[in-house]
Structures are given as C-alpha cells and as structure tokens.
C-alpha cells in the first residue's frame, strides 16, 4: 500500500473535488442534467446498476432513461413521484498531480414512507477517477456500487486500500 502524501496544493484540490462531488448530487437530484454532464471528461466512463457506459452523450442518455424509470418506481403514498435526495457520508481523496481518486459512501432517501416520511432507499460506494482539465477537476470514471444489488457490492477488502493500490 502506498501512503498518501499531502503537498501544499492538497487542501485546494480536495476542496475542489468535494465541491464537484456535491454539485454532482445537486444536479442529479434537481434534474439539472446539463450541469451534471459538464462534470465529466469527453471520454468518461460511467459504471452503474444498468451497466458500463462510455462517452458523455451515452452517459447523458443512460442517466435520462434511468431517472425516468426511477420516477416511476418511487411514489409517495398519494401516488405522486417521491422526492429523492442523495447524501454523501465520508470521502477519501487521493491526489497525484493532475489525477485523483476518491472513495465515498453514499445513501439515498425518498419521501415514500408512511405519511410521506423519509425512507432510506439505497446505499453504496462511489469509486472515482478524476482528471484536472484546464484547471478544473472532472470525472473520468465514476463507478457506483450498490450494497443491496448482487454483483454491485463493495469489498470484501477496504475500499481505501484498493484506491491507494490503484494510485500507487
């Protein structure tokens, strides 16, 4: 395992990457797909429950389709589309020059419980590769693991050790 070092730029890079990750979730949850797709490199890979997608146009099309299907699945008790919100728990970020890797735990909640109460729906881990392009951090690969879907779980090893092995 290689050890993360923290140079003078690490705090700035980490802040920019954390900001990107938060903006990603706001864009996704509020259906701002123009902002969402602008966060990816042109040749990005998006690996999620419906498969591995390559390239911005294909990613956008897949996410639009997925969001439409999710809207049909999550309903409040009156039959209206539920409000879905994603939350990041804790994030590890490794930066080396113009490349970075993240591991972050996430969960999703919706108001589809009794009395429109919140109910945790899904949870998992984001495994990201990022590139700094023209001074801006972008996702070059985002792999979304879902702990409740067979074949999409994390582990069995510590995800941070796996990230460090990739970087080192």
Language model feature labels by segment:
Residues 2-5, 72, 79-168:
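A beta-strand edge to alpha-helix "cap/lid" segment located at domain peripheries
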Residues 26, 49, 116, 120:
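Short, charged/polar micro-motifs that form catalytic or ligand-binding hotspots
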Residues 7, 11, 53, 117:
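Charge-dense, low-complexity intrinsically disordered segments
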Residues 15, 19-21, 60, 155-158, ...:
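Binding-site signature for planar aromatic cofactors or substrates
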Residues 33-107:
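A solvent-exposed, acidic/Ser-Thr-rich amphipathic alpha-helical stretch
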Residues 1-39:
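Short, low-complexity N-terminal intrinsically disordered segments enriched in polar/charged residues
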């Amino acid at each position: 395992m290689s050890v993360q070092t923290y140079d003078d730029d690490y705090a700035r890079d980490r802040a920019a990457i954390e900001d990107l990750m938060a903006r990603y979730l706001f864009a996704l949850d509020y259906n701002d797909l123009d902002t969402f797709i602008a966060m990816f490199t042109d040749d990005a890979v998006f690996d999620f429950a419906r498969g591995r997608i390559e390239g911005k146009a294909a990613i956008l099309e897949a996410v639009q389709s997925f969001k439409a299907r999710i809207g049909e699945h999550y309903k409040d008790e009156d039959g209206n589309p539920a409000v879905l919100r994603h939350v990041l728990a804790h994030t590890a970020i490794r930066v080396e020059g113009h490349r970075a890797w993240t591991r972050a735990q996430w969960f999703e909640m919706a108001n589809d419980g009794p009395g429109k109460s919140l109910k945790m729906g899904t949870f998992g881990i984001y495994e990201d590769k990022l590139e700094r392009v023209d001074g801006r951090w972008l996702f070059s690969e985002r792999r979304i693991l879902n702990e409740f879907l067979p074949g999409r779980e994390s582990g069995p090893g510590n995800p941070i050790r796996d990230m460090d092995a990739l970087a080192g």
